[in-house]
């Protein structure tokens, strides 16, 4: 290499070094002069301040700053607490599931949120907080500050609307608005109001970046907003999207809403259905009206149900949804037009219409009609134009305006719907009813029927039936009504009287609204057949029968033991709640008590004490007070009272048993005009007795002794124990029973198979705890009682003897087979040999063997 070449290379190297230093200086200077994204904890003005002049998220961040997932192009230097600094991409997560991971740069959209520092755990270390960017609220408000998000925005008179936003990333980026029409065409620039910007920020409100959320005219709970003029675009549905201007346009950082822009000034009324069952609620919506408007909906008096009261007519429009007021308009006693609430409706002399005042909220006014107060016909409902303070005051109908008769007020829309008559059924009682008995009263009702009344008819009008001291029954939410354990004849009204006598009648159910013919708010005691049938009603035939009485006393072998002195009784008494049970002995002593009848019309009473009676013949009586619930001709009106009369009066003194029984009968079933019922039985009260009636004997030592007997003791309360005793009265085995029927017959089995019993004479003893009885039994050797086989059975083996003989020739017929299968004859021959024995049989076998050998020799010669 020449000196000249070396010099040229040195010059080039110098130029490169100088250029590199210059470039580095320029780069460093550029970084130092870059716009600051913010100074973290001291940050106050936002990315659109005069110091930065940028709207996106590029720039430096300082210690303590909040950064967001998805941010790109951000830088910063952070002290590590040891005198050094690190870049943003070297910060580490302080805690949590992902502790220690690095904060990547650019920041991924799914980077775990939390605190990141240069040197976690070291005092003086610096860092940032990572959050998820979010728009937490997006609301479209009309010029009256009504929320029309997702509904209708009226475009009229160049009134502007606002798109208001709450979000958390104002330190990172501005918000950007995008508006598209229903064809997907972007119309953002067109719909923006004059002077409005398509980008905003919470912290800025100036000519370049106006923020209507900060101008004091809007709800200051919003961070930022955009001003639009709906009159700038055509009618239709528009999609509004708000998101960050650069990086933060994903997930929760972006929010979308729709709005229907219309220029139509006429509101419309839509009904949920054009046909409802009377009593069913009918919902409606008012649409195409600016947010915050108030409209009147009206149903005229001619559409009302005839039997309802004024206070109910005032409830035609339900106080639900967006309804701010409801009531009636008519004339008072002085002839003045007045609007009254339901509570004052009865003060009207005449009624013109029912009204509801409904507010447009969220683009729609929602209301509902209570159709149970309307006639079952075609009903007209009118929607009046929005009130501008002319017919409303404080969102209520003013007092001296009649919308129907005053031509000043026009309707925006009207609709009609059909009201169909509802249905009622009465499912119980049905068929037959025993007077005085308790039954369930139940049935079904159409939706909207709140209460029903029960009526009964003989030949004339329908008479009200009192149900458990009430005149009506409420309908449950599942459209059924039900009352349990009701005595239809037990009330004080005309219908109860009808059902208290045997016969065939009509029982019916009617909507309470149709049972108030004079509209006084209470059901009528009586309805004509026409009045009953013209309402929502249903009726069935019901046959009423008289009370009955059946019963029996439980005795054992016709007796009750004086050791027990207790007796049971059971039976059926339809239509009764209580009965009298009485006992009279031959000496005139009496025991009487009252018992209750169960809901299923049965009665059962155990362990009635009869210890006051003498032994001997006893008569037992079950007495019912009958249909009129009176014993005799008013002798007593209660079972307990009549029982006391029997014990304390009829059985007092020196009366005989017959005299006591006579007094019971003459004051009950035999009294004048009495409808009492009685059941009579007789038994013997005697000493306790348990006897052994039969024992099978003799019995083998491994057999079973069967013991049977009778008793007059009560089972369950007593146990009969049976023992086998040896000749020294030592117990060999024992068993017991506490079950026997009313005939007193009992039985016990003593199993000897597990007992080591020697043959001999033994005793069986039965003991009921108070009484015993014995019988002897002989035990013999096991197997000694087996019967010998009959002589006619002996020949049976002989009849089978010829069978081997008939089978014997079979080997001979098979003998030629050895030509093809030699072993088979040998097997057959051996079988025959084992089967047959006797003199000369061995010689025959030898002969057969010789013949077989000869045949084999001949075969070989051939």
Swiss-Prot record:
Gene Ontology annotations of biological process type: cell wall organization; regulation of cell shape
Protein location: Secreted, Cell wall, S-layer; Cell membrane
Parts of the chain that traverse the membrane: 838-858
Signal peptide start and end residues: 1-34
A GO cellular-component term linked to this record: S-layer
InterPro entries cross-referenced by the UniProt entry: Csg_halobact, PGF_CTERM, Surf_glycop_sig_pep
PGF sorting signal, short sequence motif: residues: 839-841
PTM comment text: Glycosylated. Cleaved by the archaeosortase ArtA at the C-terminus, with removal of a short hydrophobic segment.
UniProt feature, compositional bias: Low complexity: 802-815
Biased composition (Acidic residues): 784-801, 816-833
Principal location class: secreted
Region feature Disordered, mapped onto this chain: 35-60, 101-126, 200-220, 752-838
Record's compositionally biased regions (Basic and acidic residues): 206-220
Biased amino acid composition, Polar residues: 43-57
Pfam families: PGF-CTERM (PF18204)
Keywords, comma-separated and alphabetical: Cell membrane, Cell wall, Cell wall biogenesis/degradation, Glycoprotein, Lipoprotein, Membrane, S-layer, Secreted, Signal, Transmembrane, Transmembrane helix
Glycan attachment positions: 442, 520, 550, 702, 761
Family membership noted in the UniProt record: Belongs to the halobacterial S-layer protein family.
Entry-linked NCBIfam families: halo_sig_pep, halo_surf_glyco, PGF_CTERM
Free-text function comment from the UniProt entry: S-layer protein. The S-layer is a paracrystalline mono-layered assembly of proteins which coat the surface of the cell.
Protein name listed in UniProt: Cell surface glycoprotein
């Amino acid at each position: 290499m020449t000196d000249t070449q070396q010099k040229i290379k040195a010059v080039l190297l110098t130029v490169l070094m100088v250029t590199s230093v210059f470039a580095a200086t320029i780069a460093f200077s550029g970084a130092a002069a870059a716009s600051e994204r913010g100074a973290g904890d001291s940050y106050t003005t936002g990315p659109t301040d005069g110091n930065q002049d940028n709207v996106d998220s590029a720039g430096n961040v300082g210690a303590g700053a909040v950064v967001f997932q998805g941010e790109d192009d951000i830088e910063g230097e952070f002290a590590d607490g040891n005198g050094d600094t690190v870049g943003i991409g070297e910060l580490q997560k302080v805690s949590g599931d992902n502790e220690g991971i690095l904060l990547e740069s650019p920041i991924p959209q799914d980077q775990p949120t939390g605190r990141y520092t240069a040197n976690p755990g070291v005092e003086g270390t610096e860092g940032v907080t990572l959050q998820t960017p979010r728009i937490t609220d997006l609301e479209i408000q009309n010029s009256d500050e009504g929320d029309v998000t997702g509904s209708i925005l009226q475009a009229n008179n160049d009134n502007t609307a606002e798109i208001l936003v709450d979000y958390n990333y104002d330190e990172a980026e501005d918000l950007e608005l995008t508006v598209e029409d229903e064809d997907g065409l972007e119309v953002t620039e067109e719909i923006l109001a004059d002077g409005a910007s398509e980008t905003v920020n919470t912290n800025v409100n100036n000519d370049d970046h106006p923020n209507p959320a900060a101008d004091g005219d809007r709800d200051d709970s919003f961070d930022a907003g955009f001003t639009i003029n709906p009159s700038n675009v055509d009618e239709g549905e528009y999609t509004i999207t708000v998101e960050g201007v650069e990086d933060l346009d994903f997930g929760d950082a972006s929010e979308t809403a729709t709005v229907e822009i219309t220029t139509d000034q006429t509101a419309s009324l839509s009904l949920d259905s054009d046909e409802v069952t009377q009593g069913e609620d009918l919902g409606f919506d008012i649409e195409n009206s600016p947010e915050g408007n108030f409209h009147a909906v009206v149903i005229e008096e001619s559409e009302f149900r005839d039997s309802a009261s004024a206070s109910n007519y005032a409830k035609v429009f339900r106080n639900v949804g967006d309804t701010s007021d409801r009531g009636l308009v008519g004339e008072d006693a002085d002839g003045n037009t007045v609007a009254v609430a339901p509570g004052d409706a009865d003060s009207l002399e005449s009624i013109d219409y029912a009204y509801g005042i409904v507010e447009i909220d969220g683009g729609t006014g929602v209301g509902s009609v209570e159709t149970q107060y309307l006639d079952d016909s075609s009903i007209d409902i009118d929607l009046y134009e929005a009130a501008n303070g002319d017919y409303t005051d404080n969102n209520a109908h003013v007092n001296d305006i009649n919308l129907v008769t005053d031509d000043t007020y026009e309707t925006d829309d009207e609709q009609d719907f059909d009201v169909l008559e509802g249905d009622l059924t009465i499912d119980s009682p049905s068929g037959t009813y025993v007077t005085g008995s308790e039954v369930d009263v139940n049935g079904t009702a159409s939706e909207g029927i709140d209460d029903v009344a029960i009526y009964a008819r003989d030949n004339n009008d329908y008479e009200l039936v009192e149900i458990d001291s009430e005149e009506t029954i409420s309908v449950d939410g599942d459209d059924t009504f039900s009352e349990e354990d009701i005595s239809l004849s037990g009330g004080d009204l005309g219908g109860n009287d009808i059902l208290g006598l045997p016969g065939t009648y009509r029982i019916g159910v009617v909507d309470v609204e149709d049972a108030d013919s004079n509209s006084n708010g209470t059901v009528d005691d009586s309805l004509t057949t026409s009045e009953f049938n013209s309402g929502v009603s249903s009726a069935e035939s019901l046959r009423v029968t008289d009370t009955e009485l059946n019963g029996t006393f439980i005795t054992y072998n016709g007796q009750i033991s004086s050791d027990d002195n207790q007796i049971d009784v059971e039976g059926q008494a339809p239509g009764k709640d209580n009965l009298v049970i009485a006992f009279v002995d031959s000496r005139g002593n009496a025991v009487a008590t009252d018992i209750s009848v169960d809901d299923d019309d049965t009665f059962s009473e155990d362990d009635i004490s009869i210890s006051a009676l003498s032994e001997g013949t006893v008569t037992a009586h079950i007495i019912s007070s009958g249909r009129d619930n009176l014993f005799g001709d008013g002798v007593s009106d209660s079972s307990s009272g009549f029982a006391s009369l029997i014990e304390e009066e009829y059985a007092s003194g020196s009366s005989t048993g017959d005299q006591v029984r006579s007094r019971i009968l003459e004051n009950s079933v035999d009294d004048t005009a009495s409808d009492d019922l009685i059941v009579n039985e007789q038994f013997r009260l005697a000493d306790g007795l348990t006897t052994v009636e039969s024992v099978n004997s003799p019995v083998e030592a491994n057999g079973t002794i069967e013991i049977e007997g009778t008793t007059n003791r009560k089972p369950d309360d007593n146990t009969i124990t049976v023992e086998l005793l040896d000749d020294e009265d030592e117990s060999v085995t024992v068993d017991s029973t506490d079950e026997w029927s009313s005939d007193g017959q009992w039985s016990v089995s003593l199993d000897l198979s597990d007992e080591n019993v020697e043959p001999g004479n033994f005793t069986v003893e039965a003991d009921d705890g108070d009484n015993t009885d014995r019988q002897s039994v002989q035990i013999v050797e096991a197997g000694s009682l087996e019967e010998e086989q009959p002589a006619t059975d002996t020949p049976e083996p002989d009849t089978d003897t010829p069978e081997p003989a008939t089978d014997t020739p079979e080997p001979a017929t098979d003998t030629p087979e050895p030509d093809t299968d030699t072993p088979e004859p040998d097997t057959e021959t051996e079988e025959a040999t084992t089967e047959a024995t006797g003199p000369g049989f061995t010689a025959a076998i030898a002969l057969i063997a010789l013949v077989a050998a000869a045949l084999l020799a001949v075969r070989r010669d051939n």
